[in-house]
Amino acid sequence: MTYLFRFLTVLLAASVFFTLKAEAQVADYDKVNGVLSFENGVGSVTASKHSVLDVSTDHNKLGEHSLVWSWNKKGAYLSFNEAVPYLPENPDPKETSVSSFVFWVYSPKTLEGSLKFVFLKDGKECCHFTYGLGFQGWRGAWVAFDRDMQGIPEIGMDEIRIYAPEDVKKGCLYFDGIIPASFQDVRYHTPDWQAPFINEQTKIHWLVLNNSWKLKLDIPLKDKLSASDLQDMDTVKARFVELITEKAKPYTLKKARQIYDSYDISFNPDGTIKGKPIYFIRYGETFLNLNISDAKATFQKNGQLLRTLNDHLLRIAVSAMRAEDPQKKAEFTRIYLDLTRHLLDQGFEAGSGQGTLHHLGYSMRNFYTAPVIMQEALRDAGLDKKVQQAMEWFSGVGEIKVAPKEPGMDIDAFNTSLMGRMASVIMLEDTPYKYAYMQALSRWIDNGMKHTEGLRPCFKRDGSVVHHKKSYPAYATGGFTGAVDAVWMLSKTGFAISKQSHQNLKDALMAMKFYCYDGYFPLAMSGRHPDGKGTLIPEHYERLAKAGSPDGSLAVDASLLENAPQKGTRTFGFNCSMSHRFGHRLVTIAGHSRYLWAAETYQNANHYGRYLTHGSMQTNGLFRQDGWDWCHIPGTTAAVLLMEKMKSNVLNVDQYSGYEEMLLSDEWFAGGVTHKGVSGSFGMKLHEHDKYNGSLRARKSFFAFENRVVCLGSDIESSLEGAPVHTTLFQNYVEDVPEITFSPYINDRRDIIRNCHSEVYFIQGAQACHTKGIQQSLHEETDKPTEGEFEKAYIEHGDIVRDGRYEYMIFMPADNNDVMFAHDENALEEYSKALPYAVLRHDTSVHGVKDHESGTRAFAVFEEGSVDSMIVSSTPAMLMYSIEADEMTLSASNPDLALYEGPSDEKFDADGKRIERSIYGREWVDNPCGVTYITLTLEGLWDIVEGNGCDVTTSQNNRQTTLVFKSREARTEEIKLRRTSL
């Protein structure tokens, strides 16, 4: 392959330095991209006296060759006469990456001392750093010029020198994949044993491995282990092995040999191993700013990914464990051990940072599992301690050696770190130290399940599991796997977690069962994956049940296994949503606020879902994406745009975030209240972010009683010319529905409309617009055209809207009689003449209704003032009450999460528009929810007869009763009062 051909390939493809040869490992590299991979000789590199340079195939990390340097006298050095394209700032102000030096170095044997890397301009040193040796195999680093090096880097540096350790007379090292200067994400440089000064102030949990390693265990050691102690440790290990092997499929020996051969494993004359270079997938990001965008894909295509090898290792370990033939067992074991040696040699050893290790968890899952199965074989091969230390390093388990300072932990830690940490401790020899380490592990898991404050991860008192600063079921399920498995593994041993933490986990699982549609997440709770595919995992409930009840009184917790329909109404303050159940029906109502984002969008996910929580109301779980109109999410009030214009413009807005969009409102009023556990109300002040249509505002409310929901809207305004504002009633995929033979309109007024699921909408003061047919849309991840047959209905408000409003009620069939009623047009007409509710208020300050069947009155009090004849005055709140004889049940909620006080913290540009900012960079993001108050005055004299644990004070004056509720976390406060006098 000629240089010209390679140059043209780079020029035309604008990407790849990888060869097309089937046997290639990572590829030849064209210097035009800025990486030195030594495929065509030593190039511009020179060596001092008493040292020798060459290229070698003995060891390689990028391409098939590396630079090998041998010296036999102190003071030796290498000189790279290369332009160093350092810049003090990224030319793209949207980028948060910094100029960094990137390299890989291989040491065939352990050398003492440190290398010194010096960067020069016109022969004068500008900056330098030292890099410790003391290892065998590959090591890599990202070193930021301005943050991590000593001295002052300069534009125009033109030479790099690498000095041998001062006191080492002779040695040999290999170098590869050197990038003199490139922009790397400022957040993710990883410190390690060789270069602990790199990004040393980082707090990111993936990157603090060096700090965790240094910690000392704070639990006193027993003098001697009892038989019970040893049995407990054996029980945990046996359960661990059961977990990791129950679904693992063994390989045939033929397949295992093919896998082994694919890694090109061989041994050099000096005994060192060589084979196909292995990369953690995120290392591919190293090349992004070199116009090489597909490095990750190439690693995958060439079979070079860490995750792939780790997955193979688990299945090979299972194959060895289950093999009955001694010869086959021996060969599976040999294959496993050689691949493990290769992985260690590739830099996956204790103390190695590899440049970056951010979000390492998924790739390393089975790095930890297979060794537990193969512990005896590793011990026989003399690899057990080295492997255990690598497990301990990469899992960051050292963090657990000291008691946690605050409750909770990231749900990702349950998902991606917990099993690795447990395996790392299980791999230790059975000593008092291991027992104490197991106690520390149990303490850490227990602490992780404790309730946390504000938006800190992850378990909340309302049953939510918070990730990315909002309730996030899709991440919760992954975390539940680790959490449930851990509780089961430790159950009924001396390491069992506490009753309260066990209960918190159970509550979160039961909450998920409550808010899911037959196991499927509501659209508004699908995070950045609104594809209708996210589900709870039944195995979580089954395994946690086997762990027994939280209080230990039951060997099996059967309540987790019940399949009876869920009942009642619940609000989820940390999701800004309400779930209402009646019969088999579930309604999900969702909003957003100045604390909780409207939608999460990434460059490759949820491009069109910005309206997901614009006051949405989902009545069934039958979502289909093909042809879905993203402008018409049921319940929402939003501007209708061409689908191409709906696509989010995803930016990297600050150093606290990546390329993502998570827009906030500037309004705090968004949330719900429940009444007697069976009905509920939800209200919000909608104000879309200025990034798109900041002129859109509305006040929206929903009042749910049995199989009916009353929906009110007022103060709707928008000035986006040419983009009509619609309040969507429904949108349903109809290709799977039997042919509809009836008209959706019940009358000529078009104020009663029925959909394909026999849901009936009664509209007041407006007509419903209904369409049915093939819809074209765009896929939320790929932008590819999609189509499908849908029906939808909406109320149109116009494009330039002022003081818009709506009122409608939805009737949802909950049994066969309801379905028959929904298809009786005469009955529907009669029903519409005396609907089972009355609107009490529908203005800027208050939305309120009375449900005739239950007698319950419900209000969204947006502004302080009078409410009705009973509630003389109230501060902003969601309120519901019902009276039977002289007793009132009063429910109240202040939807303000109160993470900060005062006006919105938004910042504005020169035109007065809100600037897009990451939620992670807000000063209040880790604050606890503050105390909030609801003050209301009732007509008449009332005494509290049931306080239900509420913090409420009363005072009476002028034949009126004033109540002051003290609350937090947007929870419902419900009390019962008795009238003593009118």
Q: Which ranges hold each PLM region?
A:
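Short carbohydrate-recognition loop motifs
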Residues: V55-S79
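Aromatic-lined, polymer-binding surfaces characteristic
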Residues: L230-P530
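Extracellular polysaccharide-targeting segments
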Residues: D28, A164-L209
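Extended polysaccharide-engagement surfaces of secreted carbohydrate-active enzymes
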Residues: G479, A486-V945, S955, S967-E973
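Extracellular beta-strand ligand-recognition surfaces/modules
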Residues: S100-F103, K116-V118, G140-F183
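Extracellular ligand-binding interfaces
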Residues: W71-Q150
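Extracellular carbohydrate-recognition regions
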Residues: Q25-H50, D192
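Bacterial Sec-dependent N-terminal signal peptides
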Residues: M1-Q25
